[in-house]
């Protein structure tokens, strides 16, 4: 199975688009190379009231997905966006590393 470069709970920075420069936590990774990021790509959705589900109508603000190519993972050591590489350890397991300093992201 291929290892994903960005996973749930990673902190990412938007590198292009309307929210450029903002950072947030990945809430969900969608199968079509898209991400839901907390506080990024917010839209207002108008919702009708639904008494069957006890839902109140109004204007809701929610996140839409953003393509994975529009974000970069946040490197806390360098305090900036970084690229992700994949390194195979001696025991055969693969880990994600930061390209700038070679530091392991997760074990």
UniProtKB/Swiss-Prot annotation:
What is a single cellular component term in the Gene Ontology annotation?
ribonucleoprotein complex
Q: Does the keyword rRNA-binding apply?
A: yes
PROSITE patterns, alphabetized = RIBOSOMAL_L24
**Keyword terms of this UniProt record:** Ribonucleoprotein, Ribosomal protein, RNA-binding, rRNA-binding
| Xref: InterPro entries | KOW, Rib_uL2_dom2, Ribosomal_uL24, Ribosomal_uL24_CS, Ribosomal_uL24_KOW, Translation_prot_SH3-like_sf
GO molecular function annotation: rRNA binding; structural constituent of ribosome
The biological process GO terms on file are: translation
What the entry lists under CDD domains is as follows: KOW_RPL26
Any single Pfam family the record assigns to this protein: KOW
**SUPFAM superfamilies from the UniProt entry:** Translation proteins SH3-like domain
UniProt keyword annotation of Ribosomal protein present: yes
Role noted for this protein: One of two assembly initiator proteins, it binds directly to the 5'-end of the 23S rRNA, where it nucleates assembly of the 50S subunit.
PANTHER family linked: MITOCHONDRIAL RIBOSOMAL PROTEIN L24
Query: Subunit structure, per the record?
Result: Part of the 50S ribosomal subunit.
Q: Which family does it belong to?
A: Belongs to the universal ribosomal protein uL24 family.
**The protein's name in its UniProt record:** Large ribosomal subunit protein uL24
Specify the species: Coxiella burnetii (strain Dugway 5J108-111)
Gene for this chain: rplX
């Amino acid at each position: 199975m291929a290892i994903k470069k960005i996973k749930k709970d990673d902190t990412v920075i938007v590198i292009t688009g309307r929210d450029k420069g903002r950072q947030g936590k990945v809430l969900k990774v969608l199968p079509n190379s898209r991400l839901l990021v907390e506080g990024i790509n917010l839209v207002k959705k108008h919702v009708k009231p639904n008494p069957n589900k006890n839902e109140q109508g109004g204007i809701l603000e929610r996140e839409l997905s953003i393509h994975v190519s529009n974000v970069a993972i946040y490197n806390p050591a360098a305090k900036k966006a970084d690229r992700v590489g994949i390194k195979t350890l001696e025991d055969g397991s693969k880990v994600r590393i930061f390209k700038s300093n070679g530091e392991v992201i997760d074990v």
